[in-house]
Amino acid sequence: MSITIKLGQLAEFLGATLRGDKDIEITGLATLQEAGPGQVSFLANPKYRKLLVDTQATAVLLKPADADGYAGNALVVPDTYLAYARISHFFDPKPKSSAGVHPTAVIAADALIDPAASIGAFAVIESGVRIAAGVTIGAHCFIGARCEIGEGGWLAPRVTLYHDVRIGKRVVIQSGAVLGGEGFGFAQDKGIYHKVAQIGGVTLGDDVEVGVNTAIDRGALADTRIGNGVKLDNQIQIAHNVQIGDHTAMAACVGISGSTKIGKHCMLAGGVGLVGHIEICDGVFITGMTMVTHSITEPGSYSSGTAMQPAAEWRKSAARLRKIDDMARRLQKLEKAIETVTCADNRSSDG
């Protein structure tokens, strides 16, 4: 797919200040270093400012301070990365699906599918499903009994929704994601595990995105709940009964244990792990590889992951860490010895 749009049209769409030729044609996006004729680029990170000098981009998205002194065509905006995100959709080559049902799809007789939805090849849609207008169901998707998918949803090929999954409007779910799988619940008796039926479901709000191979387990009793605007990267595990507040984002390989509650506008970096039955308040940022073992009640940034260092230094640090208990005992003995000497000196002075 190719598209041509005039620079003035982009400026109007963004509400940007245009410096340059409004009639010049734009055909794509690229980085400052790789952009060529017909392409728009952007400067979001100050460390790339030096690339402005030699960029071949036809136009650049710039903040007012960076636009001063730039001789080329510019769209001046308060937030260049946000502006780039907004215009990126004009040039998205993702194929658009036509409304209708592929002849190989298997659909239950009582499923309610809006005529404006698109159902791909070999999709399976079970009894009681409701699919709203503008929804795209990719090839080989499985939509279990009584699932509901709101307007404008997009499911990539090979998405699996178990029964009783309810999805809001404009939700995007990438390939391999599984929503509504059984939670990891077992009762133990004399060393033997007995399965607990997971009778809840999964509820997603509006404008949620779920990455490739991410799993969201169904609740044991009530639903596992994902709030509006939540963004989940690839290969995330969300266990049963978890609740995630609106507009929280998580990078790849986060693992959240059962019944944990995460607030609104939180950010979890890659590889973060959370134990079960804890609560994270709104506005928390957790850095990569952090292990969260208790509730967080104050907004802010939290870390426990060990930062990289040269291997030789890391080995020395690891060796010292193994001796830390012994060092603590020696320090306690030294403190007691100093305290004894100090007390004796004080008695001598008093005498």
Curated annotation (Swiss-Prot):
Catalysed reactions, semicolon-separated: a UDP-3-O-[(3R)-3-hydroxyacyl]-alpha-D-glucosamine + a (3R)-hydroxyacyl-[ACP] = a UDP-2-N,3-O-bis[(3R)-3-hydroxyacyl]-alpha-D-glucosamine + holo-[ACP] + H(+)
BP-aspect Gene Ontology terms: lipid A biosynthetic process
Superkingdom of source: Bacteria
Listed InterPro entries: Hexapep (IPR001451), Hexapep_transf_CS (IPR018357), LpxD (IPR007691), Trimer_LpxA-like_sf (IPR011004), UDP_GlcNAc_AcTrfase_non-rep (IPR020573)
Pathway involvement of the protein, from the record: Bacterial outer membrane biogenesis; LPS lipid A biosynthesis
Keyword Repeat tagged: yes
Enzyme active site: H240 (proton acceptor)
Keywords: Acyltransferase, Lipid A biosynthesis, Lipid biosynthesis, Lipid metabolism, Repeat, Transferase
Gene Ontology molecular-function annotations: N-acyltransferase activity
EC number(s) stated in the UniProt entry for this protein: 2.3.1.191
GO CC terms in record: membrane
Subunit composition and interactions: Homotrimer.
Protein family per UniProt: Belongs to the transferase hexapeptide repeat family. LpxD subfamily.
Job description of the protein: Catalyzes the N-acylation of UDP-3-O-acylglucosamine using 3-hydroxyacyl-ACP as the acyl donor. Is involved in the biosynthesis of lipid A, a phosphorylated glycolipid that anchors the lipopolysaccharide to the outer membrane of the cell.
Annotated HAMAP family: LpxD
Name of protein: UDP-3-O-acylglucosamine N-acyltransferase
